[in-house]
Structure formats: C-alpha cells, structure tokens
Amino acid sequence: MLEKITFPEHEYQSVQDWLNRQGYCYTTRVYKEVGKYKVGESYLAPWGDILRIDEIQTYRKVSDRPFCDEMSDAEKEEIRKYSEDMGLPYEFIRFSRSI
C-alpha cells in the first residue's frame, strides 16, 4: 500500500496540468511535513496518480528558493510563516508521475 502525498484541493488541476505539460512539477513542504517524503519513493496523489519524488532541496530562506520571483506575496508569506520565521528549514520537492 502506497503512502499518500497531500496537496490543497485547489491545486489538484494545476499540478496535473504541469505534469501533463512538463512531465514534472514542484511542491514546497514546511513544518511537520519536512522529512516526510523521500527521493526515489512513490506516493499516491489524491486524484489517483502515483507520483515519484525525484529531488529534494532544503532551504532556510524563502528568497533562496528556485522560482521565488514567480511566487505571489501570499505564497511567499505562507512559506515564511512556517519556516523562516520559526527558524526552521523547508523542502522544495521535484516530482513526476511514476511509470
């Protein structure tokens, strides 16, 4: 039985669109989810896809995150609230569909 990977429901379609278009996607994990997912492991997405973790990068400052300039201020603040402001790291995870 595969473990599940979670996403906010409002992101389901955009994640699937990225996977269809690029073959991979990224997610950011903070606070209690740091360390939960492992490179090379597969997880069940809420919409039924099996997703494989390809790479995990750990950061301490939101400004160090790749594609930071593409994020909204609200997204940056959400990550900062549960990582940088608490003195904790966060993870930037690349994943793809498992074939």
Report residues per predicted region:
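A generic structural signal for short beta-strands and their flanking turns/coil linkers
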Residues: 24, 47-49, 91
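Short, flexible surface segments
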Residues: 36-39, 47
